[in-house]
Design a protein with these regions (language model features):
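Glycoside hydrolase catalytic-domain context in secreted enzymes
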Residues: 1-163
Length: 163
């Protein structure tokens, strides 16, 4: 039911040329300590309870972006969880849109970007562009990675007919 409702909503909004953000991906079911909690979950429960609606929406409605959750999932923060962001979302579900952090959730921006994030929402101190520039200068970020992230962000605007 959740997947069907969200799919219809996202398709309707995006038909007007307005981008959408599907959130909070994934296993975000509490507000208490949501920035520090660690959701320990087995694969079957993850797939059947927490990911099934996301999968339906991603595959059918193709939202402009997916927002990663604050919490840790099996020890790794949502915004840098390679398994969820790259292996499941990108490779398995073939998602092409943007993957964005929640506000202030990119607590290791280089690791977040390398593990599947494409856009950071800032924390109270702002964006971490200096950290990314330094990582590029010292070779921790490659030209290909930078090109892929930039292409992804620009494709979102093109998909909405904004450029």
């Amino acid at each position: 039911m959740t997947g069907k409702l969200a799919t219809g909503y996202i398709e309707g909004v995006q038909s007007l040329g307005i981008g959408t953000s599907l959130k909070h991906y994934a296993v975000n079911s509490q507000e208490t300590r949501r920035m520090t909690s660690n959701s320990q979950i087995d694969e079957r429960t993850l797939r059947e309870i927490y990911l099934s609606a996301f999968e339906e929406v991603v595959k059918k409605a193709k939202p402009t972006s997916v927002m990663a959750s604050y919490n840790r999932i099996n020890g790794e923060f949502g915004a840098r969880n390679k398994y969820l962001l790259t292996d499941v979302l990108r490779k398995e579900w073939k998602y092409q849109g943007g993957v964005v952090s929640d506000w202030g959730a990119a607590n290791d921006i280089v690791s977040c970007m390398k593990n599947g994030l494409t856009l950071e929402m800032p924390d109270p101190k702002g964006f971490h562009t200096d950290v990314l520039k330094e990582a590029y200068k010292d070779g921790r970020i490659t030209d290909q990675e930078l090109d892929n992230w930039t292409k992804n962000v620009l494709q979102n605007f093109v998909s909405l007919h904004k450029i």
